[in-house]
C-alpha cells in the first residue's frame, strides 16, 4: 500500500538493516478505547506492507482507553517501545515495552507508566545525553495544567524506571512568536498545547527539539534549541516553524541512502490522517524542509 492509504497519527520510523519500520497511532480508535499498535514495513518509503500488529493489550492491562504515539528505539541490543496509554479511572502516561524484534511482540517492561502517576502525561520519547545518561522526554498535558509543558526524567540504565524527579524544560506559552491558544468545553479558559517532542543533534553539536502545538494555520511542527547541547540547557523557541499548516507530531530519521527525513501526520483531521515524508536540510546549525523552501 501507499502512505496515502495508511491511516495513522504520530508516525515514527525505525531504519534497520535496509528496512523501514513505521509505527503510529491507529486513527480509527485514536479518541476512544484502543487495544494495540501496528507496524508497516517498506524498502523504499513508497510501497508498504502491513499492518502487522506488534502489541496487543492483554486482558489484565492497566489502562482501558487510548493507545497513542508508539516510538521504537534500539538500545543495547533490544527494541524498546515508548507508548502512551490512557485510562478512564487513573491518570495516563508513557510506559516502556520491550521486544527482541522490531516486529514484536512487545510486552510491558516498565511497571505501568514511567511518567508521574499523578500527572496527565503523553508522548514520551527517548534521549541519551553525551555522557550516556538515558532520559524520557515527555508532555505534561494542558488538560491538567492549561499551559502544556515539555518535561524530562532520568531513566535507569536498563530503562526499567525513572531515577529522578521530573524537570520542566519549557511551557508552550514560551513560543510567543507563533503559538495560539485553544478552548475546550470540558475545561474553561484558554489553553496551550504541547505534543510530540523529539530530539535531534546537528553535526555542530546543537541539540534541537521538535514539538507540536497550534499556530495560525492549525497544527504545527516547531523547533526549540538547548543552549548547552544537552537536555539540561536553557531552551529557546524558534519563531520559524518547520512545518506550519495542518500537520505535526513528527520525528526525524536517516534514509537508507543517508538522507535526512522528517515524517509527520497530515491533515490533522480524524480518519483523514496519513504519514508524509519530507527531505530535511541541515544548515546554519538548524533544519529546514527542502520541499517547502
Language-model regions: role of each:
Residues 1-293:
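Carbohydrate-active catalytic/glycan-binding domains of CAZyme proteins
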Amino acid at each position: 500500500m501507499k502512505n496515502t492509504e495508511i491511516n495513522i497519527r504520530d508516525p515514527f520510523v525505525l531504519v534497520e538493516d535496509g528496512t523501514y519500520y513505521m509505527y503510529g497511532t491507529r486513527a480509527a480508535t485514536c479518541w476512544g478505547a484502543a487495544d494495540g499498535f501496528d507496524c508497516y514495513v517498506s524498502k523504499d518509503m513508497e510501497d508498504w506492507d502491513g499492518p502487522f500488529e506488534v502489541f496487543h493489550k492483554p486482558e489484565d492491562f492497566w489502562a482501558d482507553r487510548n493507545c497513542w504515539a508508539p516510538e521504537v528505539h534500539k538500545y543495547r541490543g533490544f527494541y524498546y517501545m515508548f507508548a502512551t496509554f490512557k485510562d478512564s479511572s487513573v491518570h495516563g502516561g508513557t510506559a516502556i515495552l520491550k521486544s527482541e524484534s522490531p516486529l514484536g511482540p512487545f510486552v510491558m517492561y516498565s511497571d505501568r507508566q514511567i511518567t508521574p502517576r499523578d500527572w496527565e502525561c503523553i508522548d514520551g520519547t527517548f534521549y541519551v545525553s553525551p555522557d550516556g545518561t538515558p532520559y524520557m522526554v515527555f508532555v505534561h498535558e494542558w488538560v491538567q495544567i492549561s499551559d502544556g509543558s515539555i518535561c524530562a526524567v532520568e531513566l535507569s540504565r536498563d530503562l526499567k524506571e525513572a531515577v529522578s524527579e521530573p524537570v520542566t524544560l519549557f511551557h508552550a506559552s514560551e513560543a510567543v512568536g507563533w503559538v495560539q491558544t485553544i478552548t475546550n468545553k470540558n475545561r474553561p479558559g484558554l489553553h496551550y498545547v504541547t505534543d510530540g517532542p523529539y530530539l535531534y543533534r546537528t553535526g555542530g553539536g546543537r541539540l534541537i527539539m521538535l514539538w507540536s502545538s497550534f499556530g495560525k494555520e492549525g497544527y504545527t511542527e516547531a523547533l526549540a534549541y538547548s543552549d548547552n547541547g544537552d537536555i539540561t540547557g536553557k531552551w529557546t523557541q524558534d519563531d520559524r516553524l518547520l512545518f506550519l499548516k495542518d500537520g505535526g507530531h513528527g520525528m526525524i530519521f536517516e534514509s537508507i541512502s543517508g538522507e535526512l527525513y522528517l515524517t509527520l501526520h497530515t491533515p490533522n483531521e480524524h480518519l483523514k490522517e496519513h504519514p508524509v515524508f519530507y527531505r530535511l536540510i541541515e544548515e546554519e546549525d538548524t533544519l529546514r524542509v527542502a520541499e517547502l523552501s
